[in-house]
Amino acid sequence: MLLIPAIDLKDGHCVRLKQGDMDQSTTFGEDPAAMARKWADAGARRLHLVDLNGAFAGQPKNKAAIKAILAEVGSDIPVQLGGGIRDLDTIERYIDAGLRYVIIGTAAVKNPGFLKDACSAFGGHIIVGLDAKDGKVATDGWSKLTGHEVVDLARKFQDWGVESIIYTDIGRDGMLSGINIEATVKLAQALTIPVIASGGLAGMADIEKLCEVEDEGVEGVICGRAIYSGDLDFAAAQARADELAGA
């Protein structure tokens, strides 16, 4: 089970939002590269970056912080990034800079042709982030709920060559209320590509529950507020996940 620390970037700093609200942000660090090194040293095997300003602006905004993170840990562990990725040039620049995966969210739903082109041009590097509430997909930093069913869209994206799906339950994100295991497993069972759980990770109990469903296709989990608030010790959680997997 991949435990993936999240580093959310706003104005060059590491922050956490509550339910995607830019006005409800808590700053957890002024030095994103140092934060990346901290998680790598704690045993992280992948990092999850979000360019929050970019997500809302529709274009990359935290380039200096992202570059610093890649310089610090990019040669040690894979790094994935979402937020503001709307064109092929942006993807190419990020991959050339050392990013392993780009995460396409809103643009995948609103501009499926772009996602198709991205999968063709950068096969193996494209992850789709699907944010949902009650099984329906949301877009635009969660501000708009669509009529699309998560499973239907994910199957279509799988056919186009997406590497994996990050599934976020937006009713739970940043709330420490527990991962929506049932919905995550339901999606994973409908697909042949891996699903990464996100939204609401509260503590070790969630990690243990996720390890039980790893064989269903749940490859990992994004670790956000819980590892910053102290509700989850990241190194201990990764060690426990490895123990449960018999690693």
Swiss-Prot record:
MF-aspect GO terms: 1-(5-phosphoribosyl)-5-[(5-phosphoribosylamino)methylideneamino]imidazole-4-carboxamide isomerase activity
Pfam families recorded: His_biosynth (PF00977)
Q: Which InterPro entries match?
A: Aldolase_TIM, His_biosynth, HisA_bact_arch, Isoase_HisA-like, Isoase_HisA-like_bact, RibuloseP-bd_barrel
Its annotated pathway?
Amino-acid biosynthesis; L-histidine biosynthesis; L-histidine from 5-phospho-alpha-D-ribose 1-diphosphate: step 4/9
Task: Keywords in alphabetical order, please.
Answer: Amino-acid biosynthesis, Cytoplasm, Histidine biosynthesis, Isomerase
Q: Which reaction does it catalyse?
A: 1-(5-phospho-beta-D-ribosyl)-5-[(5-phospho-beta-D-ribosylamino)methylideneamino]imidazole-4-carboxamide = 5-[(5-phospho-1-deoxy-D-ribulos-1-ylimino)methylamino]-1-(5-phospho-beta-D-ribosyl)imidazole-4-carboxamide
Q: Name one GO cellular component term.
A: cytoplasm
UniProt KW NAD keyword = no
Q: What is its main location?
A: cytoplasm
Could you tell me the superkingdom of the organism this chain comes from? Answer: Bacteria
Q: Where in the cell is it found?
A: Cytoplasm
Query: Which EC class heads this enzyme's classification?
Result: isomerase
Protein name listed in UniProt: 1-(5-phosphoribosyl)-5-[(5-phosphoribosylamino)methylideneamino] imidazole-4-carboxamide isomerase
Q: What is this protein's gene name?
A: hisA
